[in-house]
Amino acid sequence: MIHPSAKIHPTALIEEGAVIGEDVFIGPFCIIEGTVEIKARTVLKSHVVVRGDTVIGEDNEIYQFTSIGEVNQDLKYKGEATKTIIGNSNKIREHVTIHRGTIQGCGVTAIGNNNLLMINVHVAHDCQIKNNCILANNATLAGHVELDDFVIVGGMSAIHQFVIVGAHVMLGGGSMVSQDVPPYVMAQGNHARPFGVNLEGLKRRGFDKPTMHVIRNIYKMLYRSGKTLEEVLPEIEQIAETDSAISFFVEFFKRSTRGIIR
């Protein structure tokens, strides 16, 4: 079903059964195949391919030669029914690839709202990107990677399968990330190592000085106290009882399975 207000270029190919919403623009040579839904006011510039069981939300801007919902590169994948879901108000630049999920994972590759994926970004099967993230040119996420809110991934960086990157993390360009990155941390290198707290990012997002002071103290507990993670966690949990900003740490460590960067 194509909404009457949608604008479809005559060279675009749209498979019967696709749902195209109000004021959607689909430019030259785009291909829409499968049970695709594209919601209101989303723009596909040109030469965009959307396949499979894919939902793209409202007010997204998707640039030329991007591929969304394509068969993933997991050799175990045998055509099972899996999904790709993209939220609202994302900017997805040229040559980005976003692959559908697998049944061995959560079955869904998901991107939230207000994210920027720059040129040549790859988002592999079962990745979960939350909101307000920036992935710079040529950043690569392997399968099952999770990015929490406000993560910045520098250009030419690569993140290993199953890694979790906590909220407000900044990864410098060219980083190779093979372990989980705690919230609020700046990291860079091959392999990525922590280099302090992302204070500039926190200031821009309205964190007050007392909260940033507590976050810095937790960073010191994790990386400069000489204590093991098991020794530090009860102290962090105690602080989190009275400071909601610190609850990010507690929730992160409950999910972490690969150990944290050191």
From Swiss-Prot:
Its EC number is 2.3.1.129. It comes from Haemophilus influenzae (strain ATCC 51907 / DSM 11121 / KW20 / Rd). It catalyses: a (3R)-hydroxyacyl-[ACP] + UDP-N-acetyl-alpha-D-glucosamine = a UDP-3-O-[(3R)-3-hydroxyacyl]-N-acetyl-alpha-D-glucosamine + holo-[ACP]. Pathway: Glycolipid biosynthesis; lipid IV(A) biosynthesis; lipid IV(A) from (3R)-3-hydroxytetradecanoyl-[acyl-carrier-protein] and UDP-N-acetyl-alpha-D-glucosamine: step 1/6. This is Acyl-[acyl-carrier-protein]--UDP-N-acetylglucosamine O-acyltransferase. Involved in the biosynthesis of lipid A, a phosphorylated glycolipid that anchors the lipopolysaccharide to the outer membrane of the cell. Homotrimer. The lineage of its organism: Bacteria, Pseudomonadati, Pseudomonadota, Gammaproteobacteria, Pasteurellales. Gene3D superfamilies: Hexapeptide repeat proteins, Udp N-acetylglucosamine O-acyltransferase, C-terminal domain. Keywords: Acyltransferase, Cytoplasm, Lipid A biosynthesis, Lipid biosynthesis, Lipid metabolism, Repeat, Transferase. One of its GO terms (molecular function) is acyl-[acyl-carrier-protein]-UDP-N-acetylglucosamine O-acyltransferase activity. The keyword Ligase does not apply. GO terms for biological process: lipid A biosynthetic process. Belongs to the transferase hexapeptide repeat family. LpxA subfamily.
